[in-house]
Amino acid sequence: MLQYGAPVITATRETGMDSQVVLALSDTGAGVPLRELALVGLTAAIITYFATGWVRVLAIRFGAVAYPRERDVHVQPTPRMGGLAMYIGVASAVLLASQLPALTRGFVYSTGMPAVVVAGGLIMAIGLIDDRWGLDALTKFAGQITAASVLVTMGVAWSVLYIPIGGVGTIVLDQVSSILLTLALTVSIINAMNFVDGLDGLAAGLGLITALAICVFSVGLLRDHGGDVLFYPPAVISVVLAGACLGFLPHNFHRAKIFMGDSGSMLIGLMLGAASTTAAGPISQNAYGARDVFALLSPFLLVVAVMLVPALDTLLAIVRRTRAGRSPLSPDKMHLHHRLLQIGHSHRRAVLLIYLWVGIIAFGAASTIFFDPGQTAMVMGVAIVVAIVVTLIPLLRRGPDGAQEP
């Protein structure tokens, strides 16, 4: 069997009436390359940080500037195209990873990391065009499908799907189902990140948090499977993305000197989709025990984490606008981040609150690879209660007449 461009040994273990499929790559036992992963992530951060200043000048020269609109939060013209700087950092870090002895074998057995560079370059270029000249929704959607198709063509695709209810178990996907599932998830995450990019530092911070969570999860898989190269792609992709987001964030946090634009938000979404797919897509969950099955479902929860805020925001917006007799696509200033500002949170605090909510879900999902799921759920429950209280503090401080208490 060929999986992610890697030779996979398939073994069938008969136990009575049960049959388990065990997938193993032909190169294991190298351990967890933590130092190399840290170096690659740091490289992405440093290069992105310094490239952003150059891209800002370039954006102003080419007229890629976001002028304030009625529904926008920013009040002064701000250059876009930050995704170009992030892509420079990503491509440079992946190139470095391909030259490091401890990580090179991941490129031999997998096409996941080169696929991200190629597809990421395509989605970033589409975003650059939109940042400068603007694209209609259909053209942009076609570009997203094309970029996601490049990932699939180069071997980044779900091959099995685990359904933990109704006794369904593991479903081996045929080629059509694999392609459709991968395209649907990837394009959904791309649009989720594009949609959530409404406050300074929000998309970059959410990309950083979710990428770090996927990296932690991937390191846990590497640890538990003796450094199996199957888990190199999600570890490298996620740490590179985390580094790029970290390097861009100082330029983008309130008040932003530059916006990442669609070139950046769509790049983040595509890389998160690729990292999640390579973390769980090729794994046969029947080969593991109950605890590992829960852990291997965590990439789904990581996808939920990055999509939770925009999905909830979108649903509420559709209901709100439909009840008001307006088009669901009509713009307004009632999005989640607008509401956080309206109840009394500052711009920075609103962003940090959304970081908190996404971080609870993302790291809660990732931690199942290290801790008991029941204990993880308890900690997450406490964290959610704390997050609710912190979110509602401005309302709790108000008196009965709605005035702020001293």
Curated annotation (Swiss-Prot):
InterPro entries documented for this protein: Glycosyl_transferase_4
Catalyzed reaction equations: trans,octa-cis-decaprenyl phosphate + UDP-N-acetyl-alpha-D-glucosamine = N-acetyl-alpha-D-glucosaminyl-1-diphospho-trans,octa-cis-decaprenol + UMP
Localization (cell): Cell membrane
Reported regulation of activity: Inhibited by tunicamycin.
A molecular function (GO) term: phosphotransferase activity, for other substituted phosphate groups
Membrane topology classification: Multi-pass membrane protein
EC primary class: transferase
TM segment ranges: 40-60, 83-103, 109-129, 152-172, 176-196, 202-222, 229-249, 263-283, 299-319, 351-371, 376-396
UniProt KW Transmembrane helix keyword: yes
Keywords (A to Z) from UniProt: Cell membrane, Cell wall biogenesis/degradation, Glycosyltransferase, Magnesium, Manganese, Membrane, Transferase, Transmembrane, Transmembrane helix
GO BP: capsule polysaccharide biosynthetic process; cell wall macromolecule biosynthetic process; cell wall organization; lipopolysaccharide biosynthetic process
Cellular component per GO, a single term: plasma membrane
Phenotype upon loss of function: Cells lacking this gene show drastic morphological alterations before lysis and are unable to grow.
Names of the cofactor(s): Mg(2+); Mn(2+)
Broad class of where this protein is predominantly found: membrane
Annotated metabolic or biological route of this protein: Cell wall biogenesis; cell wall polysaccharide biosynthesis
Enzyme Commission (EC) number: 2.7.8.35
Function in brief: Involved in the biosynthesis of the disaccharide D-N-acetylglucosamine-L-rhamnose which plays an important role in the mycobacterial cell wall as a linker connecting arabinogalactan and peptidoglycan via a phosphodiester linkage. Catalyzes the transfer of the N-acetylglucosamine-1-phosphate (GlcNAc-1P) moiety from UDP-GlcNAc onto the carrier lipid decaprenyl phosphate (C50-P), yielding GlcNAc-pyrophosphoryl-decaprenyl (GlcNAc-PP-C50).
Further facts: Mycobacteria use decaprenyl phosphate (C50-P) as a lipid carrier in all known cell wall biosynthetic pathways, rather than the usual undecaprenyl phosphate (C55-P) usually used in Gram-negative bacteria.
The family this protein is said to belong to: Belongs to the glycosyltransferase 4 family. WecA subfamily.
Name recorded for this polypeptide: Decaprenyl-phosphate N-acetylglucosaminephosphotransferase
Native species: Mycolicibacterium smegmatis (strain ATCC 700084 / mc(2)155)
